[in-house]
Structures are given as structure tokens and as C-alpha cells.
């Protein structure tokens, strides 16, 4: 009998549409001869299942089940979370699933909450001896002078929401008198803002996952953008070249992969994660930018690219991850 898998997408953030595209990718990747897939859409207004005819039926939040039009009650064996942003990337949905006893594909509540808060995550990684960019955090209502920012971090700086992804609300600021404007822009996306030192170098990203007691480290992707930085437009409107495997030395590749593996273990991750880095031009230690616990899974996203470059079959990888969660519940 096939296992019932909920593809949980949507969410409450500006990354709603991106999440739906990831769900489309996963729907094509996951083995439907082995699993019954159900698209579950979460919005602030409703949690519902999208049926084959395009209609929607509500999720029963008591146990995350639903009733089909013919009266059959469907209970899921596992939830594959592909929400980018709240509540699927910040630990809230994971906590709910923990309470009702439903296995899920991604990191647990603590790891998800930690990594979604960029400043807290980088400070934790710094405490573990991992190199991160210097930054100042501001909460709504707090202020910092332009002189303090420039003296502490130099210019340019990145100003971005402390929580969130897809570079929404992010600005690269090159002159001091534009800092406040960038802070206000970031505050439209979150109540906390990070002002982060710019680190020159090559941007790379590394995916990894653990299943059946074995860690799989994927080839690196090098990110080359014609925009000023890897912003939302570059990510989703083709203003970027993504080169997999990255054009770096084997030694540097191993260094980044080892750091990714170490971070996976430090935060207690599960499922697939992706860690973004800057490689300084002097060959010194890579700088961690952020950790992504629900990476994009469209057909052109980094993780599918890296899986293909590793010579793996993405359907088999998905099966491995799903079975690992089902067998370790």
C-alpha cells in the first residue's frame, strides 16, 4: 500500500509563489509509483488540499488530515515541507507536527528557528569557531548612527531583514546616507534588520543530506550575477549564471564541504540543507553567509543541479530521504 505524502507549500511570506514552484518540482521528482502525493496549501486564511480537479478541501488541524468529496478520511504518513519563510522554515510548523506526531522531511523546530534568524545563527556559528561576516542587528524602534555603521563595518554593507529569504528587502548600500533608507526598506519585511559587512570574493553554495546513517555532500555551485548582488531579480529572472561544479580547487571544495557537514551536525539538521559561502580571494577561510533548511526545489534550483552533477538520480534521493524519516519515526 502506498504511503500518503503531503507536499506542504505556500506559507505566510512574500516567498509564497516561490514555494509553489518548489512544490511543482518535488511533485515531478518524488516517485509516484511508490507514494501518493497530496498538495497542501497553507495561507493565513486557510489550510487546504488542492485536488486534481482544482478544487480545495480543508485540512483538519486537529490531526492534519482531510476528507475527500466521497467521504474518505486521508491521514498522512509524512509531510514534505517546502515552504520558504514562515511557518514552514522558522520552526512553527515543525512544532505543530511534533505535537500531533506526524513525521516531516526537514530540520526540527530548534534548527529551523535558529537558522531562520540570521543574526542568531551566525553568532552561534561564530561561537563554534566558524567564520561569519561581522554584523549589527537592529530591532524596530532602535537606531544606529551612520558613523557607527561605517566605523564598525566599513562600506559597502548589506542591509537585510533578519528573517526571510530570496533576498527580499535586501539592499547593498555603498554610501552612508543611504543606510537609513535601506533599513526602512528591510523593516517592511521583518521587525529586525541586519547591517552586515560586505565580504568580497566568490559566492558558492553547498548542499548536503543525511540518510541511513550516511552523509552525502553535494558538488558546489558557483554563483555569478550580472546584478550588484544575488538579489530576488537575479535569482528568479535569469540575471545569474550558476556553475555546477564550481570553478575552484579540489582543496577549497573539500574545505567548504567539510564546513557544511560540520554545520549540519552542529545545528542538528535533518533532510536536505544548503549553506551559502563567500570565498575570499586570498584563499583564507570561507565565510558563511547563511544556512537554508528548506532550500528551493524547482527543476533549476541549486539542490537539483548539485544532485545531477553528483551523478545521482533525484527521484532516488527523494526516496532515500522520505524512507529515512518514515523508518526513524
What are these regions (language model features)?
Residues 52-58, 95, 230-237, 293:
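Short, flexible, mixed-charge acidic loops at enzyme active sites
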Residues 2-9, 13, 114-202, 257:
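Active-site nucleotide/adenylate-binding loops and adjacent lid/helix of ATP-dependent enzymes
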Residues 38-40, 197, 204-205, 270-282:
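A short glycine-rich, hydrophobically flanked beta-strand micro-motif that places a catalytic Asp/Glu
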Residues 3, 250-329:
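ATP-dependent carboxylate activation and anion-phosphoryl transfer catalytic cores
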Residues 36, 103, 131, 192, ...:
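Residue-level detector of anion-binding/catalytic polar loops
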Residues 1-110, 114-116, 120, 139-148, ...:
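ATP-binding N-terminal substructure of ATP-dependent carboxylate-amine bond-forming enzymes
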Residues 174-258, 281-287:
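Phosphate-binding site of ATP-dependent enzymes
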